[in-house]
Amino acid sequence: MNLQGKNVTLYDMSLLXFMHPNPYHITLEQMIAVPTVLDAPRIPLIEITLRDGLGGRSINYVFPAHIDEEYLRAVIPRLKQAKVSALLLPGIGTVDHLNMALDCGVSTILVATHCTEADVSEHHIGMSRMLGADTVGFLMMAHMIRRGKSAGAARLDVKCYGANCIYCTDSAGYMLPDEVSEKIGLLRAELNPATEIGFHGHHNMGMAIANSLAGHRGGASRIDGSVAGLGAGAGNTPLEVFVAVCKRMGVETGIDLYKIMDVAEDLVVPMMDQPIRVDRDALTLGYAGVYSSFLLFAQRAEKKYGVPARDILVELGRRGTVGGQEDMIEDLALDMSRARQKQKVSA
């Protein structure tokens, strides 16, 4: 793979990802510390959003220590060169939340939908572009798109709604490099040359670095990651590792390798409540093609009902569940527990 001389823009998702091992307990001091330190290695764009995006204070997760606006207004004035992005989920975030974020100084809005439901993003993408924001159509669980469908969904966003970047998002960490190359290639062939493509990977199958390289080779100019690999499941693409790999391959990132290594080791790792690694449950997420954020829900259900999280995740994958169906995990675990009890009685 020869990428010598190519440029790539890396985006840090650490604060969004920090909500997974430390669900919604992040303080203003922590929210300020991570972006301001990431500013030094010259990270160009930093995500500052709650787990469910703008307006995402939800009983599905945990109520955060602070609201979106408090976090944004605390961080953005302290950044010297990095820009700030925010996640917005149609059905959760509203135009009022969008206006608030832009008023706080957010420059990029990621409008996230399930990969086959991009049509629900029309109003949000259109409004974001009308207000002058760098606007991304963030297509989640991209592995679930049948061959040839991803380009159609993306064209809908770009031509009808005006997104200037489309993301292929491997939310389950399921895809292999050839699959990433194929999907990115389809997007690049169908989209206007001026429309950028991004790739967001998860490390559940240990493929985040390889998949990000495949995405970049296929035409993705924006690559997501997080320092120390923070993120759901086995985490996102570890940025410090990816920067080192890019440096070895002659790909220009504009990021200071030693400084981002230090941020990961000295600041982020000590903030973790638990290590992020490819354990059996995270590996099952990737193998079964399950939304990475389901991991903690499945582990909680295991403790409550005695059904192994791995078995719950495999069944969720078999049923083709998608992000937003967290309530099904509890019901499924209860059903599986009852079925096991009946088997014991009949035996």
Swiss-Prot record:
Pfam families listed in its UniProt record: DmpG_comm, HMGL-like
Name the encoding gene, please. salH
The UniProt record lists the Pyruvate carboxyltransferase domain at 8-261
Protein name per the record? 4-hydroxy-2-oxovalerate aldolase 1
GO MF, one annotated term: 2-isopropylmalate synthase activity
What EC number(s) has UniProt assigned to this enzyme? 4.1.3.39
Q: Which UniProt keywords apply?
A: Aromatic hydrocarbons catabolism, Lyase, Manganese, Metal-binding
Q: Give the family per the record.
A: Belongs to the 4-hydroxy-2-oxovalerate aldolase family.
Q: Can you tell me which residues bind substrate?
A: S171, H200, Y291
| InterPro entries documented for this protein | 2-IPM_HCS-like (IPR050073), 4OH_2_O-val_aldolase (IPR017629), Aldolase_TIM (IPR013785), DmpG_comm (IPR012425), DRE_TIM_HOA (IPR035685), PYR_CT (IPR000891)
Q: Enumerate the active-site residues.
A: H20
